[in-house]
Amino acid sequence: MFKENTIKLGIAPIAWTNDDMPELGAENTFEQCISEMALAGFNGSEVGNKYPRNTVVLKKSLELRNLEIASAWFSTFLTTKPIEETVEEFIKHRDFLHGMGAKVIVVSEQGHSIQGLMDVPLFKNKPVFTEEEWEKLADGLHHLGKLAQEKGLHIVYHHHMGTGVQTTTEIEKLMDMTDPALVSLLFDTGHLVFSGEEPLYILKKYLPRIKHVHLKDIRQEVVDVVKEKELSFLQAVKNGAFTVPGDGVIVFDEVFTILANSNYQGWFVVEAEQDPALANPFEYALKARKFIQEKAGL
């Protein structure tokens, strides 16, 4: 289905140890995490909170297992803080990822975000940016995009539940306001379906701008409870709203077909944060790997 040597398969460490709720998977070590990723048949991962930030140390651990770094999340605060604060941290982040050989930087605006707040209802309290904030976001992303390109990297914007860029309308607005040469898109199946969007619409409309893909599934019965009981994003994660591709309700066949028939080259990263005490990360990594092999031939 996919042309040879166009796709690398990664898996996010958040299934082993959760960055937002460190108590989930606190017992899982960095070495266990990357060893199980390799054993499950993946080529690499994004960066988690237990990963060493010394590139020499990290490279050695990964090379022993034939793994690479695909990217790492970066929180921007362009709508709520002076741009200089974001830029200072971004440059360090960019240089680290450049040193690890990554080609994209995952960015997500966290101004007004509720994704990390345990008791704030996800659907009821979703932030909405003012026009002035949209302008700050677009201008700031252009600046970060230029900084990334100084080292040969691209920024990929991660639409995300509980943030100001979550819905189809918001994604379209961001794409309309930003230069395709400077701001690319991360396509995340799980966040789109969780939000009630149509992922294939976004995929088809912005295919040339998509430079990174997160493969994530959802358990619809949990999402329904999140809405009914007005739960937060973190409560949704703890209750199992997300799972690996093939274990939920999302149909991936057309997603893979569209991407295979496109010029997409880069990473597919399985990202399915759930409680590792309830969903063994290695077991679910194997499930995901088998599903991708069967459905995408990768």
Swiss-Prot record:
Keyword Protease recorded: no
EC annotation from Swiss-Prot or TrEMBL: 4.2.1.44
Sorted UniProt keywords: Cobalt, Lyase, Manganese
Pfam families xref list: AP_endonuc_2
Pathway membership, UniProt: Polyol metabolism; myo-inositol degradation into acetyl-CoA; acetyl-CoA from myo-inositol: step 2/7
The keyword Manganese is annotated on this UniProt entry: yes
SS bond partners: none
Reactions performed catalytically: scyllo-inosose = 3D-3,5/4-trihydroxycyclohexane-1,2-dione + H2O
GO MF annotation terms: manganese ion binding; myo-inosose-2 dehydratase activity
Cofactor(s) annotated in UniProt: glutathione; Co(2+); Mn(2+)
GO biological process, one term: inositol catabolic process
Family statement drawn from the similarity comment of this UniProt entry: Belongs to the IolE/MocC family.
Name the record gives this protein: Inosose dehydratase
Protein source organism: Bacillus anthracis
Gene encoding the protein: iolE
